[in-house]
A protein has these predicted regions:
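Alpha-solenoid helical repeat scaffolds
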Residues: 2, 38-41, 85-89, 107
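Short, structured motif recognition centered on aromatic/hydrophobic residues
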Residues: 32-35, 77-83, 101-104
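A general structural-boundary detector
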Residues: 11, 15, 63-66, 84, ...
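Solvent-exposed loop and edge beta-strand segments that line ligand/cofactor-binding
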Residues: 1, 62-76, 86-89
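CBM-like carbohydrate-recognition segments
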Residues: 41, 45, 55, 102-171
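Intrinsic, low-complexity N-terminal interaction/targeting segments
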Residues: 45-70
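Beta-propeller domains
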Residues: 20, 24-46
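Structural helix-adjacent loops and short alpha-helical linkers that scaffold large soluble proteins
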Residues: 4-29, 86-98
Length: 171
């Protein structure tokens, strides 16, 4: 329950000075506000979060050559787990959580299986759901990258080295 969570936190961090607790709480609140600001939008409204952002513009940005500006599905799912653990989410956070969960439901891939040894996507009745590691901003299409910096819409166009060395699909 919420009361138990708060009581545990109060006991667990009782050694922390009250002033520092207040500063940490304010920093945490600013972090949540930033998460809300960074959540991307598509034609349906709020969607997911990008993997990385430009430090000044806060727009989705490139990281490594095969990590393009895109929605980061696996990382967004982890972020949802965190947000769902908060004891008293605000109305804005609840809207954010529902929007991201709805995005995941709308874009689940079924009847496809990511073969872990062959590193290929195969048709398989009843398989899934699974999601791509990255989804294109605005279109939500699965996208993939390679060391050449090119963007691909078919994971099989990615070199075997990158298919073996990167998690392109997640369950």
């Amino acid at each position: 329950s919420t009361a138990e969570t708060e009581s545990t936190a109060e006991t667990e961090f009782a050694f922390v000075d009250a002033s520092l607790q207040q500063q940490a709480g304010q920093a945490f609140s600013r972090g949540l506000k930033l998460l809300l600001q960074l959540q991307q939008r598509d034609e349906a409204g709020l969607s997911l979060w990008a993997a990385q952002y430009h430090h000044r513009t806060l727009q989705p940005a490139w990281a490594r050559a095969y990590e393009m500006p895109a929605l980061a599905v696996m990382e967004s799912a982890s972020l949802l787990d965190f947000l769902l653990s908060l004891p008293k989410p605000s109305v804005e956070l609840l809207q954010s959580i529902h929007a991201a969960a709805n995005w995941l439901a709308r874009h689940a891939i079924t009847d496809q299986h990511w073969h872990p040894q062959l590193r290929v996507l195969q048709a398989k009745a009843g398989a899934g759901p699974l999601w791509p590691r990255f989804a294109e901003l605005n279109t939500n299409r699965p996208i993939f990258g390679d060391r050449d910096g090119e963007l691909y819409y078919d994971v099989h166009q990615v070199s075997l080295e990158r298919r073996q060395g990167y998690a392109w699909y997640t369950e």
